[in-house]
Design a protein with these regions (language model features):
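Active-site cleft segment of glycoside hydrolase catalytic domains centered on the general acid/base Glu
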Residues: 1-88, 93-95, 108-117, 199-206
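Conserved, mostly hydrophobic/aromatic
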Residues: 18, 98, 132, 166, ...
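Aromatic-rich peripheral "rim/lid" segments of glycoside hydrolase catalytic domains that contact
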Residues: 37, 58, 119-122, 138-206
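Active-site beta-loop-alpha junctions enriched in small/polar residues
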Residues: 20-25, 69-73, 100-105, 133-136, ...
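A generic short-segment signal for beta-strand/edge and adjacent turn/coil regions
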Residues: 66, 97-99, 154-158
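Flexible, glycine-rich surface segments
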Residues: 83-148, 160
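Proline-centered loop/turn at the N-terminus of a beta-strand
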Residues: 64-65, 127, 187
Length: 206
């Protein structure tokens, strides 16, 4: 990681943020950094995260924000369990942002998300960001391979699979983020528009 960031820095493109791991609810680098089930000791995971963070800081210092990211954004008990665990091992993890994945058909209601964002931003004194989210604008099969978004997902998600339904979801999500106390809600990243099978997208048309 340090070498990669040094390459970026040498080209004058220091990243605004670095996410250490992706959806790390079950840890990283199994089995050494695994957590959950029979793996109840966070020490090795915290040490791995600490080393990765140290590499980022050694390269780009504090100008780059560091994100720790879990899935299941409406599950407050998961976030308390995980962040209590990794911050309670004596490593004083130097991170700036808690990143969450949130899909309403899988991860609870907007109220669940709001509660979690409010709680963890205050409990850990960190900014929060939705680093992965999306909602379907159609139930149609766009590429002949079947749709990953079903009528059942639409029902659970609570918004029509339409352009307006997608817009309403994003508007409501924005409101939830803006309502986090102390301006701790930073925004969201949408996942992932390059997988829409438009003309010229080789994977979807060839």
């Amino acid at each position: 990681m340090k070498n990669t960031l040094n390459d970026f820095k040498n080209q004058g493109v220091v990243p605004d943020m670095v996410q250490v791991g992706n959806e790390t609810s079950s840890g990283i680098l199994w089995d050494e950094g695994k957590i959950g089930g029979d793996y109840t000791d966070f020490t090795q995971l915290a040490e791995l995260l600490n080393q990765a963070i140290s590499g980022v800081r050694a390269s780009v210092g504090n100008q780059t924000k560091i994100v720790l990211h879990l899935d299941n954004g409406g599950n407050n008990s998961l976030y308390r369990w995980w962040f209590d665990g990794v911050t309670g091992c004596g490593f004083d993890l130097d991170f700036d942002i808690i990143g969450l994945t949130y899909y309403p058909m899988w991860h609870g209601t907007m109220d669940d998300l709001q509660y979690n964002l409010n709680d963890i931003s205050a409990r850990y004194n960190k900014d929060v960001m939705i680093v992965e989210t999306a909602y379907a604008f159609t139930l149609a099969d766009g590429d002949g391979l079947g749709s990953s978004f079903s009528p059942q997902d639409e029902e659970i998600g609570g918004y029509p699979a339409s352009v307006q339904g997608q817009k309403d979801f994003m508007s409501d999500l924005e409101s939830v983020i803006l309502n986090v106390p102390g301006n701790r809600g930073l925004g969201f990243f949408y996942w992932e528009p390059e997988w829409i099978p438009v003309e010229g997208a080789y994977w979807g048309t060839e």
